[in-house]
């Protein structure tokens, strides 16, 4: 059951939950650029304490396409947070005005705290370094829309796998499907041990690789996240590693013809812009699908199936 449910961690959702969400999201695609009065009179409160473009805008557009309204803020500037108001008090006030709340925060556990305080359902729009459940839902939905299925696919995840919360949530979502995951990164940027322990306990098939070119011919999906420059003490070491994980036309010469490339965005330089014009590039479509996916999520939580 989705109605009235909080969305805090990817671990909370089953394959059945995801398949129900995907079915409704596919129906919502017809309304993604129009307006349907399914949630007329409902109010979404957004509390984005961290910068966001795609996540915040897609949630706001999704609510408005459903006929609802949006209040809230992006960044603490100009709010009582600047005066020292606690997160708990901010959530209490937003809860008083809203039927559903979306929060993004730099601290892990912020969304869980909000859910404990608020009477309205709370959706985690990204908190800390490890949780971004709706992005993972979108990622897997995009794969499902492109192939028509998820089971049996080989999925490569490339880049900084330790510090990207999208990677953590994606892995925790993919455990619900029969996939093989190729984790492609420097050894010191592999996912944290807690994540590996979890996917192993769920029986996921996975393997570690130092380079993309050695496995590109096996992959159906390449999911790219940026190498985070700020994690490197030696700039030369960063430049060396960055180049070896960049997606270029040359890297793709041995790829399957039906390979798709995904990226949670924003992109820096980890995908060559020449790749944008190829059939492999699905990251902008992926971003666009964020609206119907989040329309479905909001609708199921507020109205039920």
From Swiss-Prot:
Heterooligomer of catalytic and regulatory chains. Carbamoyl phosphate binds at residues 54-55, 104, 132, 135, 265-266. Catalyzes the condensation of carbamoyl phosphate and aspartate to form carbamoyl aspartate and inorganic phosphate, the committed step in the de novo pyrimidine nucleotide biosynthesis pathway. GO terms for cellular component: cytoplasm. Belongs to the aspartate/ornithine carbamoyltransferase superfamily. ATCase family. This is Aspartate carbamoyltransferase catalytic subunit. It comes from the Archaea. One of its GO terms (molecular function) is amino acid binding. The keyword Transferase applies. InterPro entries: Asp/Orn_carbamoyltranf_P-bd, Asp/Orn_carbamoylTrfase, Asp/Orn_carbamoylTrfase_sf, Asp_carbamoyltransf, Asp_carbamoyltransf_Asp/Orn-bd. One of its GO terms (biological process) is glutamine metabolic process. HAMAP family: Asp_carb_tr. Pathway: Pyrimidine metabolism; UMP biosynthesis via de novo pathway; (S)-dihydroorotate from bicarbonate: step 2/3. L-aspartate binds at residues 83, 165, 226. Keywords: Pyrimidine biosynthesis, Transferase. The gene is pyrB. It holds the Pfam family OTCace. It catalyses: carbamoyl phosphate + L-aspartate = N-carbamoyl-L-aspartate + phosphate + H(+). Its EC number is 2.1.3.2.
């Amino acid at each position: 059951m989705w109605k009235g449910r909080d969305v805090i961690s990817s671990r909370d959702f089953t394959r059945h939950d995801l398949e129900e969400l995907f079915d409704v999201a596919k129906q919502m695609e017809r309304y993604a650029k129009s307006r349907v009065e399914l949630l007329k009179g409902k109010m979404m409160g957004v509390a984005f304490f961290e910068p966001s473009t795609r996540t915040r805008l897609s949630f706001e557009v999704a609510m408005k396409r459903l006929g609802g309204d949006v209040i809230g803020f992006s960044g603490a500037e100009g709010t009582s947070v600047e005066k020292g108001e606690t997160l708990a008090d901010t959530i209490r006030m937003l809860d008083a005005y809203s039927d559903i709340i979306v929060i993004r925060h730099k601290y892990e556990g912020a969304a869980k705290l909000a859910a404990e305080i608020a009477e309205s359902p709370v959706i985690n729009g990204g908190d800390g370094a490890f949780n971004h459940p709706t992005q993972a839902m979108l990622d897997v939905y995009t794969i499902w829309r492109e192939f028509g299925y998820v089971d049996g696919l080989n999925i490569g995840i490339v880049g900084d796998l330790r510090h990207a919360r999208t990677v953590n949530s994606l892995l925790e979502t993919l455990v619900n499907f029969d996939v093989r995951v190729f984790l492609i990164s420097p050894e010191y940027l592999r996912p944290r041990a807690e994540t590996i322990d979890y996917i192993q306990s769920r029986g996921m098939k996975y393997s570690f690789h130092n380079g993309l070119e050695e496995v590109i011919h096996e992959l159906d999906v390449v999911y790219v996240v940026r190498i985070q420059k700020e994690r490197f003490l030696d700039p030369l070491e960063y430049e060396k590693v960055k180049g070896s994980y960049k997606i270029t036309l040359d890297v793709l010469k041995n790829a399957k013809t039906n390979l798709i490339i995904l990226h949670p965005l924003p992109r820096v330089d980890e995908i060559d812009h020449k790749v944008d014009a190829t059939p492999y590039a699905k990251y902008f479509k992926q971003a666009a699908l964020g609206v119907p996916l989040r329309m479905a999520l909001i609708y199921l939580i507020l109205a039920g199936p």
